[in-house]
Amino acid sequence: MEEELICRGFDSVEVLFVDVFEKSRLSVGGDGERMLQTPQTGSLMLSSLLTTRRTISSMAALQQPSRHRFPPPNNIQRLPLRPDGQQEPIKLTEAIKQQFKQSIPLLAARVPSPSITKFKTNPEIRKALLNSKNLRSVEPDPDSTDNAFKLLLLNTPHKDQIPESTLKVFQEHDIQIKNTKLDLDWEYWMADEIIERLLPDQLTDIPASFTMIGHIAHFNLRDEYLPYKYLIGQVILEKNLAIKTVVNKIDNINSQFRFFEMELLAGEPDYTVTLWQSGCRYRFDFSKVYYNPRLSTEHDLLSSMIEKDEVVVDAFAGVGPFAMRAAANRKAWVLASDLNPASVEALETNVRLNKLQGRVAVSGGDGREKIREAVRTLWLDKPFKTPNSSPLLPDHFIINLPDSSIQFLDAFRDLYHPLSDSEGFLNAVKKKSRLPLLHCYCFTKQVDEPESDICQRVSEVMKVEISPSTVARFELKFVRAVAPHKDMYRITFELPLKLLFSSSSEESRA
């Protein structure tokens, strides 16, 4: 692991972790998002990173001196507390930036320039050096006109705070200790430090957490922070080189296509993003589709349940997080559809980007109709050129519209019956070792008894009892907490034969 990280330009694994945490902590979503997004490393699982860092930090050989952060000046004027809507939102100005200028008194060791590396790497001197991210511990000596001397900045303005062992080394080499100052300005401090120092004292939670989607930083600001939304956006934009656009989610949700309305806070009005996840490339207009990077782990988990050459029907495919993974990584055949024309356009684009034209068939339309059409399409239209060219039957149905997914499950009633007279269909169903798996994402407010609540609702719509004891391959998987007393789950089970032939006697014939 260390060789891989060092080759990216880091001196050691521990130095990398310091760099990652200091540069990326603002990219951790405030509602529990577990991904870190950094220019150096891409996406990292926060839990894995923390575990790895704890292990590595216990190794003495990799221990680094603790890094010091200078707080912003105490005399910065905080912004006034303004009820939303009473006055124009406050924006970042040059006058605000100027308040962050500060001169910090320090001591420095005046060292001959040819010996600077020798003294800087001396263990007794290193522990007394200034060690702060984005600050150099070596500066030119203003009193040395011929550059014969340089200054090693120490971490204190008081000589009695320098370790005796460090002073001894300086004395042995006749090194002068002199007063100097460290000039800091707006560029030194990180976004959360700036925002915390500027906001009114009454606002105690710092709204510096956001979701990264490509080059877009996506906020969900509470009402009390709206008067400062443009300032927050501008600070985030200036302090994160990878960010080109900062937006804030508006409460309004497009009722038909279920994507969030958003407003531009800072940067370019460019909402077309390109990103990589699990070896797949995605491009889409974030302002016109629904996409949640917090579900990346679940996308991977569900995809791992799909075997090579299985058939997947993704009726609410969005931009294709399930469809692309299933086809590219699992070598499955996928029918992907969505009601939103922008999602369909993104699906077609992503199929081309990942060179999956032969494995993913894209269409647009209502999810219920696409579920009902899927079996006929696979059996009669043969949309894929499979090795044995036989008609296909579905192995997986993915229903990912959590707010209303369960309402669509009536589409599975009698799903197979229309093809019962088609030549070879019943025999093919009989020969198949397993019936299709349904993967349905949904919300529940019964957080203490999710299984009872979800199974009851699913059973009522399907008019068949769905429970761990009545269906095969049952699983109820917690996905994430959405809000207090509201969780997201995935219910997975094998569709019962009596459901697929619910209005006929074909069940017994199959």
UniProtKB/Swiss-Prot annotation:
Main location: mitochondrion
Keywords, alphabetical: Cytoplasm, Methyltransferase, Mitochondrion, Nucleus, S-adenosyl-L-methionine, Transferase, tRNA processing
Molecular-function annotations in GO: tRNA (guanine(37)-N1)-methyltransferase activity; tRNA methyltransferase activity
Gene Ontology CC terms, in alphabetical order: cytoplasm; mitochondrial matrix; nucleus
E.C. number: 2.1.1.228
Single biological process term from Gene Ontology: tRNA N1-guanine methylation
UniProt cross-references to PROSITE patterns, sorted A to Z: SAM_MT_TRM5_TYW2 (PS51684)
Pfam family, one: TRM5-TYW2_MTfase
Gene3D superfamilies: Met-10+ protein-like domains (3.30.300.110), Vaccinia Virus protein VP39 (3.40.50.150)
SUPFAM superfamilies attached to this UniProt entry: S-adenosyl-L-methionine-dependent methyltransferases (SSF53335)
Superkingdom, natural source: Eukaryota
EC primary class: transferase
Sequence positions that bind S-adenosyl-L-methionine: 299, 338-339, 366-367, 400
Keyword tRNA processing attributed: yes
Places the protein is found: Mitochondrion matrix; Nucleus; Cytoplasm
Catalysed reactions listed for this entry: guanosine(37) in tRNA + S-adenosyl-L-methionine = N(1)-methylguanosine(37) in tRNA + S-adenosyl-L-homocysteine + H(+)
Segments of this protein annotated with the region Disordered: 61-83
PANTHER family, A to Z: TRNA (GUANINE(37)-N1)-METHYLTRANSFERASE, TRNA METHYLTRANSFERASE
Role this protein plays: Specifically methylates the N1 position of guanosine-37 in various cytoplasmic and mitochondrial tRNAs. Methylation is not dependent on the nature of the nucleoside 5' of the target nucleoside. This is the first step in the biosynthesis of wybutosine (yW), a modified base adjacent to the anticodon of tRNAs and required for accurate decoding.
Self-association state and partner proteins as the record states: Monomer.
Family: Belongs to the class I-like SAM-binding methyltransferase superfamily. TRM5/TYW2 family.
HAMAP family associated with the record: TRM5
Protein name: tRNA (guanine(37)-N(1))-methyltransferase
